[in-house]
């Protein structure tokens, strides 16, 4: 039974009902409907911390989905899972793939910046200042791109850029 049919969460149930209605009303192919169902089930599993199940659903959605814009969100969510699992290199790969298909994803730039900043902090702890500066510079580049797309967001990042004279 698909995850969307066994949700106990009121919000997930409501989302599922609305999504099902939209899928019936909006003219889409069976393949697109299946891709969306897997994507929706992936989001549900991800929100419950069931990352392995979420990844299975996202990979199946990727197999079916042909629209680059829709694929970008699937790839972005796969990146989120890898970030949560501490697999930062993999996460960045997926964020970059998402951005190739949809360059207007400020959240992907932000997440890559957060990873780079974290890696910079790790290098500081190891007293490797050259490496830390390289990571911080990369974080700054990603944050600048995120801010360019969403100027009213990422205030903390904007302050960090100003305080470190990277803006």
Swiss-Prot record:
Essential for the assembly of the photosystem I (PSI) complex. May act as a chaperone-like factor to guide the assembly of the PSI subunits. SMART domains: TPR. InterPro entries: PSI_Ycf3_assembly, TPR-like_helical_dom_sf, TPR_rpt, Ycf3/AcsC/BcsC/TPR_MFPF. It is a peripheral membrane protein. GO terms for cellular component: chloroplast thylakoid membrane. TPR repeats lie at residues 35-68, 72-105, 120-153. This is Photosystem I assembly protein Ycf3. The gene is ycf3. It is found in: Plastid, Chloroplast thylakoid membrane. It comes from the Eukaryota. The keyword Transmembrane helix does not apply. SUPFAM superfamilies: TPR-like (SSF48452). Keywords: Chloroplast, Membrane, Photosynthesis, Plastid, Repeat, Thylakoid, TPR repeat. Belongs to the Ycf3 family. GO terms for biological process: photosynthesis. It holds the Pfam family TPR_1. NCBIfam families: PRK02603.1. The lineage of its organism: Eukaryota, Viridiplantae, Streptophyta, Zygnematophyceae, Zygnematophycidae.
